[in-house]
């Protein structure tokens, strides 16, 4: 089992023991932030950063990933984010992921900081080059989008099914017109 990451080696070799981690909804103005961790059982084709895939393709890959991996998806509500802060939620998520997979290392988190959690390596844009992180990216993004599509039915004036609660021009205009709802993150600058 590898415990230290050599990115060039990982790009050329599929590591079945690697657990990729990513999140979706970190910068959204409303709704949950989803964190996902994924340990693929085999190499899968078509995986890349979820933001580079169509919604239809993400949904297709989501179903393939969950059938071919050990994974964990966590949700942090807007209330938790407001009460604890993003960094604390992310730290809590990383700790829960380590506990779930019952290993101390061989984790790769997309980004530039492991928030002080030992055994978790980081790499900027890992979701574009490491299959397990791409898979985690897809799991997190699809989960976040599904939640926002569901919640959109109760809050139609914000069009969450379209903007997924991100700070688009239209979403900010809806906040200015209708005010915030209980899903909005009050600790964020919303306008």
Swiss-Prot record:
Name of the protein in its database record: Ribonuclease HII
Main location: cytoplasm
Enzyme class: hydrolase
Matches recorded under Pfam families: RNase_HII
Superkingdom assignment: Bacteria
EC number: 3.1.26.4
GO biological process, one term: mismatch repair
Required co-factors: Mn(2+); Mg(2+)
KW rRNA-binding (keyword) present: no
Residue sites binding a divalent metal cation per the record: 22-23, 110
Molecular functions (GO terms): manganese ion binding; RNA binding; RNA-DNA hybrid ribonuclease activity
A GO term from the CC aspect: cytoplasm
Classification via InterPro entries: RNase_HII (IPR022898), RNase_HII/HIII (IPR001352), RNase_HII/HIII_dom (IPR024567), RNaseH-like_sf (IPR012337), RNaseH_sf (IPR036397)
Keyword vocabulary terms for this entry: Cytoplasm, Endonuclease, Hydrolase, Manganese, Metal-binding, Nuclease
Catalyses which reaction(s): Endonucleolytic cleavage to 5'-phosphomonoester
